[in-house]
Amino acid sequence: MNLHASQAEIDTLEGVVRRAPPGEGVVAAKVALAWHLRQRDSARTLKLVQEVMPVVRASRASTHGDAIASCHARAALAAAEASALYGEVVEAERCLLDARAHLDATWDPQAEGDTWLVEALVARTRGQAERALAALRQAARCFQQAGEGERLEIARAWTLFETMTQQPDAALSDEPATAGPGDSGMAHDAIRCAARALALACRNPAAAARAFTQAGELAQARGLVLLEVSCLLGAGAAIHDLGDYDRAARCFDAAARRARVTGWPTLQVTCDMYFGSLLCDLGAFDESRRTLEDVVEALSARPRGTLLACAHAALARTLLATRRACESAAQMDAAMALFRAADGARDLALNLILQARVLGASAQPARAIEALAEAQALVEARGFDSMRVRLCHAQADLHHRFTLPPPGGMTQPTAALHFAEAALAHGRRLTGWSARAALHDFLAERWAEQGDHQRAYAYARQALAAKEKETAQKMSYPLALLRVRRRAEMRGGPEHAIAPSSHASSRHHDGLPGSVAR
């Protein structure tokens, strides 16, 4: 059985399920359909598994080893992945054990390796990064020993993706993935392209946005819905980083609409987190705070990991923007504890910079200096070029607020100007980057203090132009869209906050063996 299927292949299976008489053929078709719909339609997967499991169990009890009984492992695997996507990790683990207990290499030789792939997804859902990587490597070993070349490519691609999630500075070949025939072609290309985007996000946001977009399109064609939505969010985040709020809002909106169709609660709340962060930059601080408080509350009920850390940090940024420094510091402390536990260099560096700004605003310069020194060491060691703008801007702000020793090699009149000019210079090296009004304002004020009114005037004009652009963005489509969509989601449809779906509730009542990637 293939790991992924095209829509045409799924349509064929649908026809078999509709037309075939009861018996071995229709059971096998239903299990195959459940497997291939596990991300395209998780609720349908669980319904199909519920239908076939009594027949499968009865067959195993009477004629151990026949074709129907051999479907047990594959059906349990499909339920495991679907349950994980709904955030029901305990049920997912149970299904995984059920699948392993009924592996039958004679009838389904790929199932053992596929079990490791599903375990990796369950592990990612639980924030168990090391377990996820170990499972992916074990999957690759299984496929290599079995001579499953297509699946081996996919397992290797997922290993690369997981590595880039944790270590985006890891070596990544500049050669594009080679499209293979059949199952592996678009699937492993999509995963490798997404891994490349993760690596580029720290260095070249514009290129990262293009790579995420390409990966998302490939993922959609192969039914990798979780990867598809993650890539939409990744593209939006990269574009947001470049200051294009309108395009970022479109990406986030597309991700939210796609996530809502899945019914996966954690994915929907993740989309809200990106919305909440964008609302802060659009000036809708109260709405941003309320949205992010809801996200933190919802994610706190799930396995604690990097996603919750990101939500705490996003809320801290909004609170900082509204001059609630003490509350912001508390959120950052919670975020940093989780980031350090996860040991991800990119997230740690990025949020050390934010923590330094929060500490500076709450009159803790010594701790702020320590945070920036640690962030700078990570940025320089890992080559996180796109973070240099934030790093230098935070250093400039800290030196302006407090009397601190000047940096070595300073060529500007003050340390604040030294770092602010460096932030602008680093930004101009990034394709598609545009300076925010706040940076131009800062430079204008600092040069005016030094009596260089010509430079101050030039920066003031640039600040005015940037403000006009930002004001236009705040008044136009994105803010209205985000507000309308959030209100609509809170009014109707499935519950907006994380809660078991109706599909999940029904299958527990039915006693099904049931089952998110980051």
Question: Would you name each region that the model predicts?
Answer:
Residues M1-Q39, K47-Q50, S70:
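N-terminal leader/linker segments that initiate helical-solenoid repeat arrays
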Residues S6, G23, S42-A43, V89, ...:
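TPR-repeat structural position
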Residues G15-R18, Q50-A61, L97-W107, R137-G147, ...:
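Amphipathic alpha-helical segments of tetratricopeptide repeats
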Residues A28-S42, C71-E88, A111-G127, R151-Q167, ...:
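Tandem amphipathic alpha-helical repeat scaffolds
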Residues A61-S62, R401-T414:
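Intrinsically disordered, low-complexity Ser/Thr- and acidic-rich flexible linkers and loops
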Residues R131-A199, R203-R210, Q214-S230, W264:
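Solenoidal tandem-repeat scaffolds enriched in leucines and small polar residues
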Residues W433, E449-L512, V516:
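Hydrophobic positions within repeat-based interaction scaffolds
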